């Protein structure tokens, strides 16, 4: 077995935290300790390492790896022998396979630019509060993921007609009696040509934090679908039955009142992301020294595309169209900007809302659910114009 340090080198600078797992810091924001390869991130938890991107980094089409959020449900693998690592493909298939990293590397690769977002991004704004990591706005990022199509690997194995779901298991180190992080996706999504077994991120090998040596990439869906550190893919005759499929990562079938309990049988799996926008500049609480300013941000919509973004500078009384950036790609956020001259000095609430090509528009208030998933309320920042 290789050490963590050797693992880091083998992963092309796949950087990890060396030593015993630090104590849990809690769900709130903490002053960031020195985490190699993750400059300036907001620490939500050090127990399993959950890091959030500050909104000021949300200013480009592609998020640098050092600023890409991290969501871990368990401990990251502490050691990995690349000579022994294998990815098995089995279950409802004719020819079970075992693949090495070299075999995956030799297959035809495809690249998908994808906005990856944790289902719980925005959970901190749910009232009443709900359990879970208290993400605010930055559990989201966009990267270029490359690797073989999952469909091509499944075709090699020969999926039987009984295959309905595809299960992913990673090498997460499970503490005690905690259930393993295992999830599945419908065969239709698994065999979509854009679903990948990613081995590269932004042109380099995946880092340890982001799933080296291989991860699933399920574009347009919640981040939990794109399992990291893959070691097993299994074709099932039905949805996987496990903690992170049920009761975990499920949405109510009908809107519920804040604080209301929902039975599991009245829920469905969380899948595609909602339409959403984010104001990156000016920052919330900023003292702006000029009445003339550029409001800038990002908008994304999962499997849909962004149709428009609107901005309000009067707390939502009126809305004006923002200018969308020229760069656009399916599954990918869109940059937007709005030029504004404040009529006078004083306090202002600036808001943004996006509408996608499916006709969905961000709601004015939080659509509460017991897990705080897929919250996409219009974004707001409060500023003070001093000039």
Q: Model-derived features: where do they sit?
A:
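N-terminal secretory signal peptides and thylakoid transit peptides that target proteins
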Residues: 1-15
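Compositionally biased amphipathic helical and low-complexity segments enriched in hydrophobic
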Residues: 10, 25-26
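Residue-level detector of alpha-helical transmembrane segments in integral membrane proteins
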Residues: 15-16, 47
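A generic secondary-structure boundary signal that marks alpha-helix termini
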Residues: 16-17, 159
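C-terminal segment of classical bacterial N-terminal signal peptides
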Residues: 20-23
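Structured, non-membrane catalytic/scaffold regions adjacent to prosthetic-group chemistry
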Residues: 27-387
């Amino acid at each position: 077995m290789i050490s963590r340090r050797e693992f880091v080198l083998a992963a092309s600078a796949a950087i990890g935290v060396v030593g015993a797992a630090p104590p849990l810091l809690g769900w709130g924001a903490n002053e960031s300790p020195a985490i190699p390869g993750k400059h300036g991130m907001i620490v939500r938890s050090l127990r399993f390492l959950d890091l959030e991107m500050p909104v000021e980094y949300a200013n480009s089409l592609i998020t640098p790896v050092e600023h890409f959020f991290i969501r871990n449900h368990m401990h990251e693998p502490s050691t990995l022998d690349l000579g022994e690592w294998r990815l098995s493909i089995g279950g409802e298939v004719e020819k079970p396979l075992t693949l090495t990293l070299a075999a995956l590397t030799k297959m035809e690769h495809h690249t998908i630019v994808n906005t990856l977002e944790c289902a719980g991004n925005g959970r901190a704004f749910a009232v009443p509060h709900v359990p879970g990591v208290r993400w605010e706005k930055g559990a989201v990022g966009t990267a270029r993921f490359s690797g073989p199509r999952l469909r091509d690997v499944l075709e090699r194995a020969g999926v039987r007609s009984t295959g309905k779901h595809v299960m992913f298991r990673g090498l997460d180190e499970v503490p005690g009696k905690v259930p393993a992080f295992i999830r599945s996706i419908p065969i239709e999504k698994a065999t979509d040509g854009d679903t990948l077994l990613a081995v590269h991120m932004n042109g380099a090998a995946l880092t340890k934090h982001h799933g080296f040596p291989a991860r699933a990439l399920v574009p347009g869906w919640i981040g939990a679908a794109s399992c990291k550190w893959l070691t097993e893919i299994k074709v099932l005759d039905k949805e996987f039955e496990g903690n992170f499929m049920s009761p975990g990562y499920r949405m109510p079938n009908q809107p519920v009142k804040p604080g209301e309990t929902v039975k599991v049988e009245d829920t469905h799996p969380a899948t595609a992301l909602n339409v959403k926008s984010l104001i990156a500049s000016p920052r919330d609480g900023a003292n702006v020294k000029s009445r003339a300013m550029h409001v800038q941000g990002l908008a994304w919509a999962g499997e849909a595309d962004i149709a428009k973004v609107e901005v309000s500078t009067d707390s939502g009384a009126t809305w004006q169209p923002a200018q969308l950036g020229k760069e656009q790609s399916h599954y990918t956020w869109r940059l937007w900007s709005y030029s504004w001259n404040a009529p006078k000095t004083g306090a202002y609430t600036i808001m943004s809302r996006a509408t996608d090509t499916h006709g969905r528009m961000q709601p004015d208030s939080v659509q509460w659910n017991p897990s705080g998933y897929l919250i996409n309320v219009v974004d707001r920042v409060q500023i003070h114009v001093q000039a």
